[in-house]
Amino acid sequence: RKIIKGTINNKPVVVFEGRSHFYEGYTNEQVFQNVNKAIELGVTNLIITNAAGGVNLTYKIADLMLITSHIDLMNRKIFQPNIACYHHPSLINILKLAGDNKIKLRRGTYAASSGPAYESKAEILMLRKMGADAIGMSTIPEILYAKKNNINVVGISCITNLLRVSNNGKTEHSEVVEAGLSAYNNFSNLIRTIVTNS
């Protein structure tokens, strides 16, 4: 895993490239290694990002979603859910910053599954009925772990594929990567704006 240190508008930042997933067979310690390294480096504000499937029918490829709640489908329950993760001023401030800077940012509920398979049609319908707006295979354990260690943390999803029961084809990993690249400008502008105003 690569760690990149730099600045954004004279503010020091650390970027972690890549992460470890539970579905790859990694332990808790390995999955939390980026957060632990951030703690070691003295980071107090953490932005955790991911690529996610869009469950909400209004979502489009390359949309960005601020995570304001979650559904934990990982069956691990490492930590007790902490609703305080999603009820602090920084979330409201980020939404305002995005609006003021004309950066399109949705808000929604992220469902975390163990993976690594993409969802079946029945699962898509179930997720929608449960109130999920997006689904992925990471992030929530890291958010809860960071919060447990008193770090201000927010999660942002990039919608890289749309989950529709009418889809005839399967989701290809290359399509997910391509969608992530198409969101680059909007995503980087959002991160830059958040850091500059933090």
Segments from the language model and where they lie:
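General beta-strand structural signal in soluble alpha/beta enzymes
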Residues: 15-17, 46-50, 66, 105-111, ...
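Short acidic/polar active-site loop segments enriched in Thr and Asp
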Residues: 44, 133, 152
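Metabolite-binding pocket within alpha/beta catalytic cores that recognizes anionic/polar moieties
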Residues: 1-83
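Active-site/ligand-binding-proximal alpha/beta "capping" segment
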Residues: 96-133, 188-191, 198
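Non-catalytic positions within long, well-ordered alpha-helices that form the structural scaffold/packing
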Residues: 39-42, 128, 147
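Histidine/lysine/aspartate-rich catalytic loop segments that bind and position anionic ligands
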Residues: 70-116
